Amino acid sequence: MTAVARSSLRSTLEPKSFGRVAVLFGGKSAEREVSLNSGNAVLKALLDAGVDAFGIDVGDDFLQRLVSEKIDRAFIVLHGRGGEDGTMQGLLECLEIPYTGSGVLASALAMDKLRTKQVWQSLGPATPLHAVLENENDCICAATELGFPLIVKPAHEGSSIGMAKVNSVDELIAAWKAASTYDSQVLVEQWIQGPEFTVASLRGQVLPPIGLGTPHSFYDYDAKYLASDTQYRIPCGLDDAQEQQLKQLAARACDAIGIAGWARTDVMQDAEGKFWLLEVNTVPGMTDHSLVPMAARAAGLNFQQLVLAILADSVQARG
């Protein structure tokens, strides 16, 4: 990344120009604990930078606080349902409070893995073949059509919650039942064997991709947040041409969904070198294990600069 590109990522706004900033975190989704960690890290960075910021753990009384507190803008650090799926974005639109990240439509689309895949399939970017599971017969049909191994996913969860790799019909049925406890809609996808990459985007630019390695069967919740043996490769290990191809694919994936502000795109590469899109995260993690801060460091931004850049985009996008 050039020096000019790095400088364009940084916010040039004075901290006080942001006004009073509410950091929204916590919530009631299955990703609450991750959101609490992310939100507290973001809040500390804003306060250390001199921003007039305060935190709201989004619970039963948060709407009253949003209405009663004088809030100039909101920094959304809610992961999963209720915060990353367009509902909070829609509420803030109604209250005329500018906020960070993508808007209502892009947030709702990206949170719905099935709809995201359908958009990508219509526009060309490759994404693994899949099926929707509603009963045991669907599991049997999916096994016949897609073969094994497969990966099972709740359609509206993040952080790999409820996901499982399966190698038989019995395992598939068990994984579908487990995933159904998180979501009424469950997807099963062809397993792509090969290295995994994640590509962060910030203010319209693609950050250095990260190669991921784990001794787990895939990059699951433990590997993301708890394990000490997860490997992160920056540079990502691809040659220049492949890395450029990966970055262009991530940019196309985000453009197709209508992503704004910041995001993170997850991609697999198969044995033939072909890239496959998995999903886009519109409110990625901001913990000490998180990937966007890691990519930002590789681009020359420390955590505080990253947080200010995300917040600055809310000014440009929504006033």
From Swiss-Prot:
Keywords for this protein: ATP-binding, Cell shape, Cell wall biogenesis/degradation, Cytoplasm, Ligase, Magnesium, Manganese, Metal-binding, Nucleotide-binding, Peptidoglycan synthesis
Q: Which GO terms describe its molecular function?
A: ATP binding; D-alanine-D-alanine ligase activity; metal ion binding
Pfam short name (any one): Dala_Dala_lig_N
Organism the protein comes from: Pseudomonas syringae pv. tomato (strain ATCC BAA-871 / DC3000)
Q: What does this protein do?
A: Cell wall formation.
The positions annotated for binding ATP are 143-198
Catalytic activity, EC: 6.3.2.4
The taxonomy runs:
Bacteria, Pseudomonadati, Pseudomonadota, Gammaproteobacteria, Pseudomonadales
| Pathway involvement of the protein, from the record | Cell wall biogenesis; peptidoglycan biosynthesis
Residue span, ATP-grasp domain: 117-312
Q: Any one Gene Ontology biological process term?
A: cell wall organization
| Gene3D superfamilies hit by this protein | 3.40.50.20, ATP-grasp fold, A domain, ATP-grasp fold, B domain
Q: Which PANTHER family match?
A: D-ALANINE--D-ALANINE LIGASE, D-ALANINE--D-ALANINE LIGASE B
What is the required cofactor set for this protein? Mg(2+); Mn(2+)
Which named protein is this?
A: D-alanine--D-alanine ligase B
Q: Name one GO cellular component term.
A: cytosol
Reaction(s) the record says it catalyses:
2 D-alanine + ATP = D-alanyl-D-alanine + ADP + phosphate + H(+)
Q: Where in the cell is it found?
A: Cytoplasm
Cofactor-binding details, from the entry: Binds 2 magnesium or manganese ions per subunit.
Give the similarity note: Belongs to the D-alanine--D-alanine ligase family.
Q: Does the keyword Cytoplasm apply?
A: yes
Cross-referenced InterPro entries, in alphabetical order? ATP-grasp (IPR011761), ATP_grasp_subdomain_1 (IPR013815), D-Ala_lig_Van_CS (IPR000291), D_ala_D_ala (IPR005905), Dala_Dala_lig_C (IPR011095), Dala_Dala_lig_N (IPR011127), PreATP-grasp_dom_sf (IPR016185)
